[in-house]
Every structure is written in C-alpha cells, then in structure tokens.
Curated annotation (Swiss-Prot):
The gene is rpsJ. Pfam families: Ribosomal_S10 (PF00338). Coiled coil: none annotated. Part of the 30S ribosomal subunit. Belongs to the universal ribosomal protein uS10 family. GO terms for cellular component: ribonucleoprotein complex; ribosome. Signal peptide: none annotated. Keywords: Ribonucleoprotein, Ribosomal protein. It comes from Natranaerobius thermophilus (strain ATCC BAA-1301 / DSM 18059 / JW/NM-WN-LF). This is Small ribosomal subunit protein uS10.
Length: 103
C-alpha cells in the first residue's frame, strides 16, 4: 500500500465568520488545483472566562466576567500537487486567523 501525502491545516480565530470565510478560500483553492479536500471540520470551541473585581479598592462581592471564545476548524488536503502547495502559500488570508500547517 502506497504512503499517500496529506496536508493538515488547523485554523483558529476569535471571530467565526472570518474563520469560515478563510476555510472556504482554502477549500476552493485546493479543489481548483485538483486536490481532494476533506473538511472544514468544526472542532470544539475553547471558552476562557476571566473574572475581575469591578471596584478598584474593596467590594469584593461585585465582580464582572469576561469570556474569550476560540473557534477552530480542521481541513485535510489529500493527494496535493505541487501546484496546490504553491497556491496555498500565495493565498492571502485575514490577519485574525491563526494557521497551522502540517505536511
């Protein structure tokens, strides 16, 4: 059985709309160059909750909570061509999206 090449792309962002648009761009680019695409697969959202005291001096009972949600997507590109890799490197994505690529 031949060892097939695969590119795994993990996307992270705080805004899910920008994340979905970026994932759609990547999938469209990969399909246009002739590669098979699996995804985007939505991964569980991380939620960080920060509790701070509202008053600067006392009144510890009065607190405020803030949360930060990190949305994640996973895309697998199966059988990528050299044209696929080249076009993915040139792809222009928004600055709010963290991209992790594993070959």
């Amino acid at each position: 059985m031949a060892n097939k090449q695969k590119i795994r792309i993990r996307l992270k962002a705080f805004d899910h709309m920008i994340l979905d648009q970026s994932a759609e761009k990547i999938v469209e680019t990969a399909k246009r160059t002739g590669a098979n695409v699996s995804g985007p697969v939505p991964l569980p959202t991380d939620k960080n909750v920060y509790t701070v005291i509202r008053a600067p001096h006392k009144f510890k009972d009065s607190r405020e909570q803030f949360e930060m949600r990190t949305h994640k997507r996973l895309i697998d590109i199966l059988d990528p061509t050299s044209k696929t890799v080249d076009s993915l490197m040139r792809l222009d994505l928004p600055s709010g999206v963290d991209i992790e690529i594993k070959l």
